Amino acid sequence: MLKREMNIADYDAELWQAMEQEKVRQEEHIELIASENYTSPRVMQAQGSQLTNKYAEGYPGKRYYGGCEYVDIVEQLAIDRAKELFGADYANVQPHSGSQANFAVYTALLEPGDTVLGMNLAHGGHLTHGSPVNFSGKLYNIVPYGIDATGHIDYADLEKQAKEHKPKMIIGGFSAYSGVVDWAKMREIADSIGAYLFVDMAHVAGLVAAGVYPNPVPHAHVVTTTTHKTLAGPRGGLILAKGGSEELYKKLNSAVFPGGQGGPLMHVIAGKAVALKEAMEPEFKTYQQQVAKNAKAMVEVFLERGYKVVSGGTDNHLFLVDLVDKNLTGKEADAALGRANITVNKNSVPNDPKSPFVTSGIRVGTPAITRRGFKEAEAKELAGWMCDVLDSINDEAVIERIKGKVLDICARFPVYA
C-alpha cells in the first residue's frame, strides 16, 4: 500500500545524497549557462503531483482513455494561456522538449529530402536546425546561412541562398546569437520564394512574453519554444501559430500525437500552465527587462577588460566571448571558471579554429543570476571576477579568491529564499 509519508531519503540514501548535493551545487554556484534557469516551487509542485499517474493520449475532449475530465481542464488552461501570452490562435502544449516540438513541425510540413535553410551551428544556430549529427541534418537537405563580419545575421546572403536553393522552409532562431532577429524581413524572404518560415524562439521566449524582444508569432507560419530557459517553466516544448489554416493545425497536432509521441506528460503540462500564468504577472516583465540589462552590463566589463564579444554586444540574454586573441580555449575557460564555482559552457565562435569539443569561446547568459536577484552592480562585479580568472587561468590562488567571493554573493542571493 502507498503511504504519503514514503520518501526517498529513508528508502534510497544513495539517490537522495546525489539529489541533495545537486541542490547545494545550485545554491553555491553562479549559473551562467544561457539555457538554464530556476523554476518556481509552484512548477515543482505541479511536477510532483498525482497528475504523473494519468495517461491521456489524444487532446482535450478527444482522448483515447477515460477518466480525463480533470486533465482536460489542466491542458486547456495551458493552451489558453500560451495563446494569450504570445498572441497566437493555435497552441500545442504536449511536446516533451523543444527538439520534439521541432521534429513535429518538420514532420508536419516537410518530406524527407526537402531543402531547408537553417542557421549554421558554428554561427549560433541549434543542433535541430540542420546539424549533420542531428535528425534534421540527416533527413533534410540543409543549406546553412550565417552572420556577417559584424557578427549580425547576413540577410543579403540569406536572401541570395533562398533564391538560389528554393528551400521549402527557412528556419529562424538560434542557441548562441546575441542580436535582434528581423522576423518581418525573414518572412518577406520566405514569401518571395513560397517557403514556410518556421521560428524556434526557445532562447528568447521569456523576453518575447515580456515585450523585451520582438515576437515572431505574427510573422512566422509556425513557432516553437521550450518552456524552460528564459520562460522559467518546466523542461518541455510548445508549438504556436497565428493566422494558419485548420488543415495546418490538424497536421501539427497529428505530428505531435500520434506522429512523434504517445501519452502527454500531464504533470509537466500542469507545470507549463502555472509557468505561463506566472509569465503574465507584472513582475515577470520586470525580471525579463533586468535579464537584458544584466547581460549588457556584463558585456561592458568584458569589453573594458580587453575581451572580444561576438557582434560587439548583446540585445538579449546572452553573449559569446571570443577567446582566440587571448590564446585560450573554451574548454580551459569553462574548467577554470568552474573551479571558481562559476558555471558557463564552452562554445564555438564564428570561424573557430578549434573542434566543437574544445572551442575558442564561452557562452554567457543572465536568466539564472537575474532570477536570484542580481542587478547591474552584481552583474558587473561578476564579470570582473570572470575576467580575473581568465587573466590568470593557471593561478589557483586567484581562482580560490574568486570562489570565496562567489560563495559570499550566493549566500546573499539564495536561489530559493
From Swiss-Prot:
Q: Its biological function?
A: Catalyzes the reversible interconversion of serine and glycine with tetrahydrofolate (THF) serving as the one-carbon carrier. This reaction serves as the major source of one-carbon groups required for the biosynthesis of purines, thymidylate, methionine, and other important biomolecules. Also exhibits THF-independent aldolase activity toward beta-hydroxyamino acids, producing glycine and aldehydes, via a retro-aldol mechanism.
* Chief place where the protein resides: cytoplasm
Underlying gene: glyA
Write down the Pfam families for this protein, in alphabetical order: SHMT
PROSITE patterns per record: SHMT
The protein's assembly and partners? Homodimer.
The UniProt keyword set, sorted, is: Acetylation, Amino-acid biosynthesis, Cytoplasm, One-carbon metabolism, Pyridoxal phosphate, Transferase
Q: Which residues carry this modification: N6-acetyllysine?
A: 54, 250, 285, 354, 375
The EC number(s) this enzyme carries:
2.1.2.1
Q: Which InterPro entries match?
A: PyrdxlP-dep_Trfase (IPR015424), PyrdxlP-dep_Trfase_major (IPR015421), PyrdxlP-dep_Trfase_small (IPR015422), Ser_HO-MeTrfase (IPR001085), Ser_HO-MeTrfase-like (IPR049943), Ser_HO-MeTrfase_PLP_BS (IPR019798), SHMT-like_dom (IPR039429)
Protein's cellular compartments: Cytoplasm
Q: Is the keyword Protein biosynthesis assigned to this protein?
A: no
| Gene Ontology cellular component list | cytosol
**Which range is the signal sequence, renumbered to this chain?**
none
What cofactors does this protein use?
A: pyridoxal 5'-phosphate
* Record protein name field: Serine hydroxymethyltransferase
Q: Which SUPFAM superfamilies match?
A: PLP-dependent transferases
Reaction catalysed by this enzyme: (6R)-5,10-methylene-5,6,7,8-tetrahydrofolate + glycine + H2O = (6S)-5,6,7,8-tetrahydrofolate + L-serine
Q: Where does (6S)-5,6,7,8-tetrahydrofolate bind?
A: 121, 125-127, 355-357
Q: Which organism is it from?
A: Shigella sonnei (strain Ss046)
Q: Where is this site: Plays an important role in substrate specificity?
A: 228
- Where are residues bearing N6-(pyridoxal phosphate)lysine located in the sequence? 229
Q: What is stated as this protein's family in its record? A: Belongs to the SHMT family.
